[in-house]
Amino acid sequence: MNENLFASFTTPTMMGLPIVILIIMSPSIMFPSPNRLINNRLISIQQWLLQLTSKQMMSTHNNKGQTWTLMLMSLILFIGSTNLLGLLPHSFTPTTQLSMNLGMAIPLWAGTVLTGFRHKTKASLAHFLPQGTPTFLIPMLVIIETISLFIQPVALAVRLTANITAGHLLMHLIGGATLALMNISPTTSFITFITLVLLTILEFAVALIQAYVFTLLVSLYLHDNT
């Protein structure tokens, strides 16, 4: 293939015009507003999935944590739909950009931490020093716990970026191998194509799982601070 290995991460264009507008409008088409809701199978499945996800994530939260339900549901829908749209051929996946993922992770993490310091100041400070710590280990543990706290948003963003990027690069490599082997060995090319199809199905699952994992970890951080 003559394309650059990272060509799938560039902004797509159609007739010289960026098609970002169509990508941005796609979630509103996939998830219609309440005044357009019709009782059909698709809407019923969407509502059932949202209720199941919100119940699983927010059932252990108190009243302060429950106020984050709408934000977390919007977050999982945004990341999930963005990841799925990125699987379309010649499309751009914003979640492969670490800057965007950090832009989501840092404010959400900071919100949970500030909520904890505001409503549970003593409990939040107590996390920096486990109970029963020997006196000579106190300075070291405080530093370690502080570093582990500040690395949480970085871990959130890097996890999402790495998983989505790795999957796209692997699909690109296998797709290139399939085309290269068509004239050399059709049988091997067919086997590689089957592998590509299976990997594509796996990537659909990974796209949804990573959206769920990202939102679930934010929910867990919120639970620890409320």
Curated annotation (Swiss-Prot):
Compartment(s): Mitochondrion inner membrane
GO cellular component: mitochondrial inner membrane; proton-transporting ATP synthase complex
SUPFAM superfamilies: F1F0 ATP synthase subunit A
Gene3D superfamilies attached to this UniProt entry: ATP synthase, F0 complex, subunit A (1.20.120.220)
GO molecular function term, any single one: proton-transporting ATP synthase activity, rotational mechanism
TM region positions: 5-25, 68-88, 97-117, 136-156, 164-184, 189-209
Family recorded in the similarity comment: Belongs to the ATPase A chain family.
The protein's name in its UniProt record: ATP synthase F(0) complex subunit a
Biological source species: Rhinoceros unicornis (Greater Indian rhinoceros)
Gene: MT-ATP6
